[in-house]
Amino acid sequence: MDPCECSKSGNCNCGGSCTCTNCSCKSCKKSCCPCCPSGCTKCASGCVCKGKTCDTSCCQ
């Protein structure tokens, strides 16, 4: 099962392998968040967080 915890307060933590701040997502996936956190460039394909920070690599 997905070890993800997500809160509307904007804090996502996926099994300790990913941390998203100000994500404001309503659901979590193993890719951390189905949405683009603030500071992360939005892309048509959507965003995923890799590592502990969100940068250009968050877009797949």
Curated annotation (Swiss-Prot):
Annotated positions binding a divalent metal cation 6: C36, C40, C43, C59
Region (Alpha) location? 29-60
Q: Which family does it belong to?
A: Belongs to the metallothionein superfamily. Type 1 family.
Q: Which keywords are on file for this protein?
A: Metal-binding, Metal-thiolate cluster
Q: Does the keyword Metal-binding apply?
A: yes
Notes concerning its domains: Class I metallothioneins contain 2 metal-binding domains: four divalent ions are chelated within cluster A of the alpha domain and are coordinated via cysteinyl thiolate bridges to 11 cysteine ligands. Cluster B, the corresponding region within the beta domain, can ligate three divalent ions to 9 cysteines.
Q: Does the keyword Metal-binding apply?
A: yes
Q: Per UniProt, where does a divalent metal cation 3 bind?
A: C14, C18, C23, C28
* Name of the gene this protein is made from: mta
Record-given protein name: Metallothionein A
Task: Read off the Pfam families from this record.
Answer: Metallothio
Q: What terms describe the molecular function in GO for this protein?
A: metal ion binding
Q: Per the UniProt entry, what species is this protein from, by scientific name?
A: Parachaenichthys charcoti (Charcot's dragonfish)
SUPFAM superfamilies in alphabetical order: Metallothionein
Where, in this chain's numbering, is a divalent metal cation 2 bound?
C6, C12, C14, C25
Transmembrane intervals:
none
* InterPro entries (alphabetical): Metalthion_dom_sf, Metalthion_dom_sf_vert, Metalthion_vert, Metalthion_vert_metal_BS
Residues at which a divalent metal cation 5 binds? C33, C35, C36, C49
What positions does the entry give for a divalent metal cation 4 binding? Answer: C32, C33, C43, C47
Taxonomically, the superkingdom here is Eukaryota
User: Which residues are involved in binding a divalent metal cation 1?
Assistant: C4, C6, C20, C23
Any idea what job this protein has?
A: Metallothioneins have a high content of cysteine residues that bind various heavy metals.
Stretches for region Beta: 1-28
The entry's a divalent metal cation 7-binding residues are C49, C54, C58, C59
